[in-house]
């Protein structure tokens, strides 16, 4: 066990809460002490939900440990069923309750409830949140479909059956959850995209799905695995038991969306899509080619996040924006293999770690010009003075925008371009700031319009204060002022030839050079010598 002030993932029961909260008609009874109820805030504060998660806590206390905590569990199960009347009941335990070994799932299964009861055993001390969400979704789908008498294990499932049935092909979108990164907007974008290609969305799960919707999953022609961390285990089970194929490409970025559509059309035996659709529908390809080449090309970028978004970001950065990827990693150990493979293709060694300090150290060593990461990478990048864009959970409330802001599909590519490029400085802007960095507008001690309320002293005030307390400082300043070199008419004429927006910097640099060289007068030759000196 490690003491830390930040974690990329919560314990697995938080993942189970994400599944229960994402769905309708599902209730989760969690055997947990009072302190584990903190997870409610993740949904009401971060996700800005208008209602609490559908979770009942047993909230046992220390004094309860001397009695029969199993009876406490049964009491809360009865209360939850009577009060909420769920269509499906999830039962599990938190990391603390796991030590008591009450096995609440087994208790609930023997209580004769008239709805599906799914007990979830999540190893809290070896697995984490995303695995818990994946396992919960898998167990819920398996538990509900196993109640169907029509289940035929190993039955052949033809993705092209829609042709003989005289209907449009239909697919399931699996994996979006609450506390996922822009999942709700991704679904809207994909529904629109698939409809344009003549494909219907049959079921979206777990987000906003009901248990009855899960029973309809096998009626689709294939499954779309949008977030492998959450849905891959379920897709594999549906493939084994119902013969349902599933897509492997996550449509984040122009190239990936193009590959995604080609994969779907091939699986569904539909005509190939228009290969030029990406350039027609998304602005990213043209924008990335039309901007100042110094703006994007060769920018060093460090990428860290969940496996799905880190892999997508690496492809977009390398192939679509012309960035140079100098770091790639993930905290999702379940996605370590594909991330390592992607890093190897880029000539890198992947960083697989859930230690934010190790990530910050790798970031500092890579010295990128842009960081693409989670909320913690935003903090680390700020400490290092590096621009950052958040591409993955865990995220802050500001990364749950009110506007429509998908990551997938053609519009998602537009959003990604804006999100990644805005933290960077334009080439001309960067050049001008470099030239004017020492001008008074950029001096840290520049007087604020709120200066009368207190705050930092101006540079002049600081010098006067120092001079008042240290007479030698005043005399040194006077002598320095007396020794300032004089500009000859020839030197002033040469200075006038320099563009106005850099003239101040050239004047200061020339005077600095003249003092160092011991020149009492500045003529045209001194200006040229200073220019050579500061360029060297």
Curated annotation (Swiss-Prot):
| Cofactor binding notes | Binds 1 [4Fe-4S] cluster per heterodimer. The cluster is bound at the heterodimer interface by residues from both subunits.
Which Gene3D superfamilies does the entry link to?
1.20.89.20, Nitrogenase molybdenum iron protein domain, Proto-chlorophyllide reductase 57 kD subunit B
Q: Where are the compositionally biased (Low complexity) regions?
A: 448-469
Q: Which GO terms describe its molecular function?
A: 4 iron, 4 sulfur cluster binding; ATP binding; metal ion binding; oxidoreductase activity, acting on iron-sulfur proteins as donors; oxidoreductase activity, acting on the CH-CH group of donors, iron-sulfur protein as acceptor
GO biological process assignments: light-independent chlorophyll biosynthetic process; photosynthesis, dark reaction
Q: Which residues form the active site?
A: 292
Keywords, comma-separated and alphabetical:
4Fe-4S, ATP-binding, Chlorophyll biosynthesis, Iron, Iron-sulfur, Metal-binding, Nucleotide-binding, Oxidoreductase, Photosynthesis
Stored Pfam families: Oxidored_nitro, PCP_red
Binding annotation for [4Fe-4S] cluster: 36
Cofactor annotation: [4Fe-4S] cluster
The cross-references to NCBIfam families, in alphabetical order and at most eight, read: DPOR_BchB (TIGR01278), PRK02910.1-4 (NF002790)
Entries under PANTHER family matching the protein: LIGHT-INDEPENDENT PROTOCHLOROPHYLLIDE REDUCTASE SUBUNIT B
Quote the HAMAP family the UniProt record gives.
Answer: ChlB_BchB
Give the quaternary structure.
Protochlorophyllide reductase is composed of three subunits; ChlL, ChlN and ChlB. Forms a heterotetramer of two ChlB and two ChlN subunits.
Membership in a protein family: Belongs to the ChlB/BchB/BchZ family.
In Swiss-Prot or TrEMBL terms, this protein is called: Light-independent protochlorophyllide reductase subunit B
